[in-house]
Regions:
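Conserved CoA-thioester-binding segment of acyl-CoA-metabolizing enzymes
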Residues: 1-53, 86
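Acidic, divalent-metal-coordinating active-site segment for phosphoryl/phosphodiester hydrolysis
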Residues: 161-167
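Glycine- (often His-adjacent) and acidic-residue-rich active-site loop
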Residues: 52-87, 103
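Structural motif
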Residues: 51, 98-99
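CoA-thioester-processing core
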Residues: 84, 88-90, 98, 104-158, ...
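C-terminal long alpha-helix characteristic of the crotonase
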Residues: 22, 34, 118-123, 171-219, ...
Length: 249
C-alpha cells in the first residue's frame, strides 16, 4: 500500500515507519495517524520502529484542524485518536519509538503508545495542551500517569512545560538516550524479532495492561473543554503567536 504522510521500509522481521509530513515538524493530522495505524497493524507481524523524518518525531496535532470544532466534534476526534493509539498499543508485537527533535502533544502521546522509547539527547518533550485551553485527548493523561505516577504526571500536564530527554530518562519515560537513537532502536527491534512470538506477545499484554474505562473520562473531558471560550482563545492565540488571554482563571 502507498502512503502520503509516512514512509515504510521492511528489513527482515522489522518494519521501520517514518512520519514524513510536508512540514519539518511532522504535525499529526488524523489522516497521518490512520496511515501509521495501517502500517503497524499490517506489518506482517513484524517488530515496528516508529520515527520521524526531518527535524522532529512530531510536534503534535495540527492545531489548524481545531478551529471551529465544538464539543461533539472534539469528542469524535478524541475517540478516533484513542482508537488509533489503543490499536498501536495493543499490537501484539513490540513497537519502538525512535524520537528526536520534538515530541509534543499528540506526538508525545503517540510515543507513549509505543512499548519502548529511545531518544536523541537534545530532544524536547511536552504535553502543552493546557496552554491552548484544552487537555491531552489521545490517552496522554493515563499513559503518562502509568509511567511516572500521579504527582509527576499532574505537574507535567498542568504546567505544559518542556523537558529534556535526560529528564525523560530520569522519569523513566524514555528507556535510553543515544545520539544513535534510530540505529539503536532498529538494532533492538531486530533482537526482539528473534524472541519467541507467543511469549513476547503475552509479556507485552501483561506489562502494558490498562482497563479500557480509564480512557473514557479523558475523551469526555476533551469534548467538554472544546465548548469553553478559553479553548477558542487558546487556539487563536497559538495561531497568532501571542500570549492567550484566558477568561476563566
Amino acid at each position: 500500500m502507498s502512503y502520503e504522510n509516512i514512509q515504510v521500509k521492511d528489513d527482515g522481521g522489522v518494519r521501520i515507519v517514518t512520519i514524513n509530513r510536508p512540514s519539518p515538524l511532522n504535525p499529526l493530522s488524523m489522516g497521518t495517524l490512520r496511515e501509521i495505524r495501517d502500517a503497524v497493524l499490517n506489518s506482517g507481524n513484524r517488530v515496528v520502529t516508529l520515527t520521524g523524518a526531518n527535524k522532529a518525531f512530531s510536534a503534535g496535532a495540527d492545531i489548524n484542524g481545531f478551529v471551529g470544532l465544538d464539543g461533539a466534534a472534539a469528542f469524535a476526534l478524541a475517540t478516533e485518536g484513542h482508537d488509533i493509539m489503543n490499536s498501536i498499543a495493543g499490537y501484539p508485537r513490540p513497537v519502538i519509538a525512535a524520537i528526536h527533535g520534538y515530541a509534543f502533544g499528540g506526538g508525545f502521546e503517540l510515543a507513549l503508545s509505543c512499548d519502548i522509547r529511545i531518544s536523541r539527547p537534545k530532544t524536547l518533550f511536552a504535553l502543552p495542551e493546557i496552554n491552548l485551553g484544552i487537555l491531552p485527548g489521545w490517552g496522554g493523561t493515563q499513559r503518562l500517569r502509568h509511567l511516572v505516577g500521579e504527582n509527576v504526571a499532574f505537574e507535567i500536564i498542568s504546567t505544559g512545560r518542556r523537558f529534556s530527554a535526560e529528564e525523560a530518562k530520569e522519569l523513566r519515560i524514555v528507556n535510553r538516550v543515544s545520539e544513535n537513537y534510530l540505529d539503536d532502536a532498529v538494532a533492538l527491534a531486530r533482537e526482539l524479532a528473534k524472541k519467541p512470538r507467543e511469549s513476547l506477545k503475552l509479556v507485552k499484554k501483561l506489562v502494558r495492561y490498562q482497563p479500557d474505562d480509564v480512557f473514557e473520562e479523558e475523551k469526555e473531558a476533551f469534548g467538554v473543554v472544546f465548548n469553553h471560550p478559553d479553548m477558542k482563545e487558546g487556539v487563536q492565540a497559538f495561531l497568532e503567536k501571542r500570549e492567550p488571554k484566558f477568561l476563566d482563571k
